[in-house]
Amino acid sequence: MKRLQRLWPLGLLLGFVAGLPLWFIQRNSTFLSGAYRYPELDKPLIHSSIESTFVSWVDPKAPQYITSFLDRARQRRSLALITLEPFPDPSRPQSDRTLVRDVIRGDYSQRIKAVLDPLCRPEQPVLLRFAHEMDNTGQYPWSVARGDDYVRLYRAVWAQARHPQCQRIHWVWSPAGNATSDLFWPGGDAVDLIGISVYSSPRWSHNGQLSSFAQVYERRRWLHRQFRKPLLVAEMGVSGTDQERRRWLLDAREAIRRYPELIGWVYFSAPQPSWIPLATGHEDWSLSPQLLGLVTSPHPSFAFHCQVLHVSLPVLHRKICRIRQA
């Protein structure tokens, strides 16, 4: 948090974790919210304060896409959340097995530089969610069995971005939230926020009932207690009938009031990717515009104010923002 604090005017009681321009600070909503939509749509979501996307660093068009995405987020007065996926170079033999080694020895340095260049522009802050859900072993090439291998990968990329021009990149370490997530912790100096995934499907319970947002979130909350970083639900999805999903979202809106460490959420409004099959069958997490409105419509949250106070006036934060240990 130290490098974030330098970006704050002393005593400023409005803003996100750091460095957001005044046009963002003055938004009505006090809880960050947004959605990833596939296919991406030109029309912005009403009240959305986060623009979310996924980028593979081996995509030759990645730098240009990042530039245009950041421009779009700025025009919409939203915070950019970019999930950077370190897929192996398909032209390299067995690169899926040697990804960590190849990154460590510098084979991907030019690719990393190419995607960091637009991210390091001084015009706006960006949340960089790098190599997400690494604790789902085997799901991605970076979902390695050994936590220390992942840590070496993460810190190698983070180190390449340690540069004065990149101070507005805020790093989001984003496990799925499994019991072994702590094995992949890259160190507090390399993490500004912890991202988690919250999904619920009636197929995942023995009685066909949806697990509530609170039930799933509570199983992830230990990450905040252990590492003392604010939480962001970086991916969220619910399946079922529209009526079931509406009820789930309404309950979620009420539940977030109980979590002062939670600063926002992002809904994954898209079908489950076909190349990441689920044991319970295909899921479509897409929401109608009406239901997405429940995700992004303003809902004040105590968490936002506590995070502001933590950064700008820590003495006052200690008096009124006692985050529960339970």
Regions found by a protein language model. Name each.
Residues 69-169:
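Substrate-binding cleft of extracellular glycoside hydrolase catalytic domains
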Residues 49-56, 181-210, 268-270:
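Aromatic- and acid-rich polysaccharide-binding/catalytic face
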Residues 68-85, 184, 189, 199-240:
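Glycoside hydrolase catalytic-domain groove-lining segments
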Residues 234-324:
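Substrate-binding cleft of secreted/luminal carbohydrate-active enzymes
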Residues 34-41, 62-70, 110-115, 175-186, ...:
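Alpha-helical scaffolding within the catalytic cores
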Residues 25-108, 238-241, 266-267:
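N-terminal substrate-binding region of glycoside hydrolase catalytic domains
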Residues 1-15:
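N-terminal Sec-pathway targeting helices
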Residues 154, 162-180, 230-239, 267:
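Aromatic-lined carbohydrate-recognition surfaces of secreted/lumenal glycan-active proteins
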